[in-house]
Amino acid sequence: MSAHLAMPSYGSVRCGHYYWPSPGSMDSASAAEAPAADLSLTTEQKTPCHPDASPASSSSGTLIQYTPDSATSPTADHPSHRPTFQKVKDKGESGTRKAKSRTAFSQEQLQTLHQRFQSQKYLSPHQIRELAAALGLTYKQVKTWFQNQRMKFKRCQKESQWVDKGIYLPQNGFHQAAYLDMTPTFHQGFPVVTNRNLQAVTSAHQAYSSGQTYGNGQGLYPFMAVEDEGFFGKGGTSCNTQQAMGLLSQQMNFYHGYSTNVDYDSLQAEDTYSFQSTSDSITQFSSSPVRHQYQAPWHTLGTQNGYET
């Protein structure tokens, strides 16, 4: 008795994309059944898959046909990849994205919008609809125009405040400077940095009356800097302008005949403080217009007492 008669007879089993023939008809039916599996793809998908006919559970039979996955076969036809390829192709043919269209307002529309903005910066949704209907525009166009106009108005307002003050926003490490005004008015700012440098930012036009003199305690040059550690002192003490300038006057000895039209270049405050001045009419020190630098020792008011004039 042959081996084919001893084994039980059962038909071929189809499970999805797999074709599992019987052992007896493996040689003869493989060539005929393999094309039939390609034609009846929809019937094979509806046929339930039996677990006892899987290749792992059966020791007899041979795998006849295997349809590869789309991820492993470049020629596989998967319907889910077609729309993506089509989108990429369409995007490649069109090139870059289209720019957003800008609304071209007429002169009458712009005039009406500006007049309304001058009287009312914020509009309610109902007012926006009414204005859009009156101008022949859409709700979004009017709303966007008012938003852009408010941003421009705030930016211009902030810049005008900076120009009026003559300063910009303070950065880290800088303190706001204060100065005194005397008749005639003279404005001079002293930005004080953290390393105790005091730089004098002088103006190009300085107006002093001819009756002002230095050293008498009344017509002193006014300057004062706001700092946490005090004015020209490291011990936390403070002094007024008359005491500071009285000390300068005693060290420099120019009480009489000194011109008041002085161009101050810089005033630096560190461990040793220097005072620089230039003048074209100095007769007491030199006969030619040169630059003089005077070094004056500064002392803390807590230890020095007799410098006030």
From Swiss-Prot:
Induction: Strongly down-regulated during embryonic stem cell differentiation, induced either by retinoic acid treatment, or by cell adhesion prevention leading to embryoid body formation. Residues 87-96 have a biased composition (Basic and acidic residues). It is found in: Nucleus. Residues 25-41 have a biased composition (Low complexity). The keyword DNA-binding applies. Residues 55-75 have a biased composition (Polar residues). Pfam families: Homeodomain. One of its GO terms (biological process) is regulation of transcription by RNA polymerase II. Belongs to the Nanog homeobox family. This is Homeobox protein NANOG. It comes from Gallus gallus (Chicken). The lineage of its organism: Eukaryota, Metazoa, Chordata, Craniata, Vertebrata.
